[in-house]
Regions:
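Short connector loops/turns at beta-strand edges and beta->alpha or beta->beta junctions
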Residues: 114, 123-126, 258, 297
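Iron-sulfur (Fe-S) cluster-binding segments and ferredoxin-like electron-carrier domains
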Residues: 120-132
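Flexible, acidic/Gly-rich N-terminal and inter-domain linker regions that tether
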Residues: 1-100
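Conserved aromatic-histidine-acidic binding/catalytic patches
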Residues: 4, 33, 37, 41, ...
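Short cysteine/histidine-rich metal-coordination sites, predominantly Zn2+-binding motifs
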Residues: 133-141
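Conserved AdoMet/S-adenosylmethionine-binding subsite of the radical SAM
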Residues: 142-156, 160, 169-314
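Short glycine-rich or small-residue beta-strand-to-loop segments that form or flank ligand, phosphate
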Residues: 107-108, 162-165
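N-terminal pre-triad scaffold of radical SAM enzymes
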Residues: 45, 90-123
């Protein structure tokens, strides 16, 4: 049940250390503590996610690498790094709406996620303040959303809107309906993409939060009735994230006719070999998820140990 996962979420370093104290050696525990003291993202991991980590070798585990920093692995940040490395705020005509490309916009509707990734490019806004970063606020706000709707409607070239954050998984069902319906009714909007890491880290929500999934299905059906595409974009980075629960959750999207595409980030030690990426793509294909993007890791504070070279991506 997703409510149990949410209730038992680990959102403090001391809670995490207590949860893993019998799973890992003392040296690893102290290394984690040092890691979070230097991290721009707060700790937020689910029991389900912790269960997928290989605790016989947590240092090299591809899921541990993504969510739990180790102080011993930190490398100096790139000299050109900025907290908002993609300059999303600079290209935002209204708060939380980035309009960089002529026909596409990124709509950051919320500033929380089911878990927090170490390599998040939005550490300037997502989650709570840390020792390293004081966040700006992009909390769910209907008045802020209305300003975004007005801007999108005023720009006829805008056809493709990505609803992200934060994470669309954390939207209430009525917010999913409101956001989806409002965007679909704007004449120039032809495509909507809900973006979420949730399916990879908490598939229980799709299986047990029926109101939320019904809202997503209703928005998709409304879009189809008006000749507009509503798709769901998820974020699996390693084959170990694809489980039986993932398959069951993705079957709900498949049965509802909702297209699901995957966006991966190329991460050192996680998926930066042809073999690991090929296996990920194959397993996603088995659960009806279309490979879509593979991003090269951006300049992110405290995550230089995960960034590959551009040549690695080319190869």
């Amino acid at each position: 049940d997703y409510r149990w996962q949410s209730k038992k979420i680990i959102n403090r370093v001391d809670k995490l250390l207590d949860a893993i104290k019998d799973l890992a050696p003392d040296g690893f525990i102290s290394d984690v503590e040092r890691g979070f003291s230097r991290a721009p993202m707060a700790v937020r991991v689910s029991p389900y996610l912790l269960s997928l980590i290989d605790w016989t070798n947590p240092v090299d585990d591809p899921l541990r690498i993504q969510f739990i920093p180790l102080g011993s692995k930190f490398l100096p940040d790139h000299p050109k790094l900025g907290l908002d490395s993609l300059h999303e705020q600079a290209d935002a005509p209204v708060p939380g709406l980035t309009h960089r490309y002529p026909d596409k916009a990124l709509f950051l509707v919320i500033d929380t996620c089911p878990v927090y990734c170490r390599f998040c490019t939005r550490s300037y806004a997502v989650g709570v303040d840390t020792d390293q970063v004081e966040k700006i606020s992009l909390k769910a706000s209907k008045s802020r959303w209305e300003r975004a709707f007005e801007y999108i409607a005023s720009r006829p070239e805008l056809e493709d809107i990505v609803i992200s954050g934060g994470d669309a998984y954390n939207l209430r069902a009525d917010w999913v309906r409101e956001l989806g319906t409002s965007l679909i009714k704007i004449p120039n909007v032809q495509r909507i993409r809900f973006a979420s890491k949730g399916l990879a880290v908490m598939p229980q929500k799709v299986l047990t939060d029926h109101d939320w999934f019904d809202a997503m299905a209703e928005v998709h059906a409304l879009g189809r009735s008006m000749g507009k595409e509503v798709a769901f974009h998820t974020h699996f980075n390693h084959a170990n994230e694809v489980t039986e629960l993932s398959r069951q959750a993705l079957n709900r999207f498949f049965d509802a006719g909702i297209i699901v595409r995957n966006q991966s980030v190329l991460l050192r030690g996680v998926n930066d070999t042809p073999e690991s990426m090929s296996l990920l793509v194959k397993r996603l294909g088995h659960i009806n998820v279309h490979p879509y993007y593979v991003y090269v890791h951006d300049l992110v504070q405290g995550a230089e140990d995960m960034r590959t070279t551009v040549q690695t991506a080319v190869d």
